[in-house]
Amino acid sequence: MTSIDILVIGHLERGADGSVVPSGTWSTSSLVRTDDGHNIVVDTSQGYMGAGIRSSFKQIGRIFPEDVDTVVLTHGHPDHIGNLGLFRNAEVLKFSGGDPMDGVTLLDTEKEIAKGVRFVRTPGHTEDSGSLFVDADRRYGPSAGESGEEGGPRLELRSR
């Protein structure tokens, strides 16, 4: 069965002065494990969250960052790309646009990464925004990777 695990959760809170500030990190990082053995990470969070990501892999068990086949970046901002070095065996995908990045495969059209897993260009706050759509027992999508509004990550669950 395809599964989705949250590695680190991006969360925003309202500061005393009314500004929006991260609580921990700005962006969420997730692990998708498919029926056919693909391991996909969506965003790698900010660099200082590396220990949290490694800890999540230990809690999940039987999988390590080196086992990840593909990393998809919902866009190229620093809070989404900070731990790419953890996934040294993975192909890294991002949609074209934004700043160029070494070692990243740029896409112009959607890509099926594994059966039932598609990376699709979607509107966002950057020209290179994309979302991962996953067909599972429940439909998960889109995974924009942003903390979104106050209150936590945006993950829309829709039943089939």
Residue ranges and their predicted role:
Residues I40-V42, V72, R139-S143:
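Residue-level marker for buried hydrophobic side chains located in beta-strands
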Residues V32, D43, V68, H75, ...:
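Divalent metal-coordination and catalytic microenvironments
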Residues S29-L31, E110, S129-F133:
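Short acidic loop-to-beta-strand element that houses the catalytic metal-binding Asp/Glu
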Residues I9-L12, D43-G47, G76, G124-T126, ...:
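Active-site metal-binding loops of divalent metal-dependent hydrolases
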Residues Y48, E127-R160:
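Metallo-beta-lactamase
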Residues V20, T25-W26, T44-K115, E150:
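Active-site HxH/HxHxD metal-binding segment of metal-dependent hydrolases
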Residues M1-I4, R33-N39, E110-R118, A136-Y140:
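Beta-strand-turn-beta hairpins that frame and shape the catalytic cleft
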Residues M1-H38:
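Zn-dependent metallo-beta-lactamase
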